[in-house]
Each structure stands twice: as structure tokens, then as C-alpha cells.
Amino acid sequence: MNKWLDLILKIHVHPFLWIIAALGLLTGHMKALLCLLLIVLIHELGHAALAVFFSWRIKRVFLLPFGGTVEVEEHGNRPLKEEFAVIIAGPLQHIWLQFAAWMLAEVSVIHQHTFELFTFYNLSILFVNLLPIWPLDGGKLLFLLFSKQLPFQKAHRLNLKTSLCFCLLLGCWVLFVIPLQISAWVLFVFLAVSLFEEYRQRHYIHVRFLLERYYGKNRELEKLLPLTVKAEDKVYHVMAEFKRGCKHPIIIEKSGQKLSQLDENEVLHAYFADKRTNSSMEELLLPY
């Protein structure tokens, strides 16, 4: 029970949202604002509830004027199926919300105009969230797809590039189709800034992924995936090949012949504990 109470206490509202709420009250648009807030809140609680169920470490649930976000202390080492469930839990809330609104309209609890307004916001938020742009749900699902096929670092970089392409397409669509829609411009700017910040933090994000592997926190490895590397390969370049959901026995070859084999933890220990950041794999085999 305490973890659910803690979740409620972690809900934070952006100050700008309070300003929007005040303007909505003054201009008589409270019904639209309440519909929007309800949909956003339920959507984010869908993510958060599954995260709590899987014992993720939640920092806060942050509600913005045009959406929300669940900030977690997880760095890419949860099972892919588990993360998929947490991501998809948000969009799934829109299904029962729409059905509930339809039922209320059918029994005349809410007016038809209110139902149409709710439907517009519900579908708009759903479709926007499924755009393949980081940090939207669609962008996170795309990252999972890339992570299943590629090493974490390559998947993250490809996701940023793909998200940037779709973000630019979104910007062009806003510019040429709905240039007077302020909310669309706010969304575009938010996504552009989020992508820029994610790009700036890309090295730090990879290091956190590696650190979590090193300390073995919350890891449920699905399979062993050997990595064959050259003796002269640097430690950091080898770690750039680490994939999610896998533990890597590292086979070191020299002149086409197997020289030795290391566990990934030995490589991580050499990098983080021994600070052998510029060592080659062959040098790791020598006494330190």
C-alpha cells in the first residue's frame, strides 16, 4: 500500500500548467482543460502503475501543459518485455477512457458536445504519443526495437537520428499545414529541446547503462551472447558492443587465433575500478 501512496506523492505539476489552468478558468475553457488534464493524468499513471508493479525506481510523475512524463531511475538493463509493458500501458488507457466517455454520453451523464471534445483530446494525445520521436511513447518503442537488434549505444544513436528526422517532418507539417496552432509549435519545440538534451547526454547515458551492468542492479539476463574482439581493441570500443538483455563472454583473438576469454564483468571492472580506460584487450590479460 505504501508504494502506491508514494506514487501519488510523486505527482508534480509544472508551474506553467497552473498558469494555463488559471487562464482556462478566466476564459471559460475549464471543461476542455479538465478533459485534457484527466487524459494526461490517467495516461501517465498507466505507465507509473506498471513501473511500480515491476518495482522500478520512480523519481516523479511530471504533468506538463501538453502532456506528461514518468521519470525513472532505470538505465536500460530491465528486460525488454518488461519495458515494453510499461511503455504500452500509457496508450492502452485511452481505450477504456474512450469507452467510459461513450457510456456516460449514452446514458446522458455528459452532453454530446462534451463527449466530442473528450474524444478529440483523447485521440489527439494518443496519436501524438505514438509518433516515433523520443521521448514520446512511439520513440521509446522504436528504441526497444533497435535495442533488440543492435548494441545499446548504436541503438540509442540510431533512435536519436530517426527521431530527429520525424521531428523535422513534424516541424514542416506544422509550418505548412497548421502554422497558427500555438499548441503544435509548443509540442515541436518541446520535442526538439528534448532531443537536443538527449543528444548532449548520450555518453553519460551509455556510461550509466554500463555502470548498472557493472553493479548488477535489477538485471535479468535472457541469454549469453559471446563477443569476438581483436587483441588490440580498446576496452571502451568493446563495451560499445554490449547489448541489452545479454551477458557477454568476450573472446579475444590475435592473428585469427583465440588468445583468451574474459567475462564482461572483468572488462567493466578494469574500466570503472582500475581506470584502465585506454587499455587494449590484450593488456587486460597482463598483471596490473
Swiss-Prot record:
Q: What is the effect of changing H47F?
A: Loss of activity
**GO function term, MF aspect, one:** metal ion binding
Q: Which PANTHER family match?
A: MEMBRANE-ASSOCIATED ZINC METALLOPROTEASE M50B, STAGE IV SPORULATION PROTEIN FB
Mother cell cytoplasmic side residue ranges read 1-10, 57-83, 147-161, 200-288
The places in or outside the cell where this protein is found are: Forespore outer membrane
Membrane topology term reads:
Multi-pass membrane protein
**This chain belongs to which protein, by name?**
Stage IV sporulation protein FB
Its UniProt miscellaneous note says: Could be held inactive when BofA provides a fourth zinc ligand, preventing access to a water molecule and the sequence of pro sigma-K.
The record's listing under CDD domains reads: S2P-M50_SpoIVFB
- The portions of this protein that span the membrane are 11-30, 32-56, 84-105, 127-146, 162-178, 180-199
Where in the sequence is the active site?
E44
Question: What quaternary arrangement does the UniProt entry report?
Answer: Forms a complex with SpoIVFA and BofA localized in the mother-cell membrane surrounding the forespore.
Q: Where does Zn(2+) bind?
A: H43, H47, D137
Query: Which ranges make up the Forespore intermembrane space topological domains here?
Result: 31, 106-126, 179
Name the keywords, alphabetized: Hydrolase, Membrane, Metal-binding, Metalloprotease, Protease, Sporulation, Transmembrane, Transmembrane helix, Zinc
- A Pfam family found in this protein is Peptidase_M50
Could you state one GO biological process linked to this protein?
sporulation resulting in formation of a cellular spore
Q: What EC class is this?
A: hydrolase
Q: What is its EC number?
A: 3.4.24.-
**Per the entry, which co-factors are needed?**
Zn(2+)
| GO annotation, cellular component aspect | membrane
Give the organism's phylogenetic lineage: Bacteria, Bacillati, Bacillota, Bacilli, Bacillales
Q: Using the UniProt record, give the first listed, main subcellular location.
A: membrane
UniProt cofactor note: Binds 1 zinc ion per subunit.
InterPro entries per the UniProt record, alphabetical: Peptidase_M50
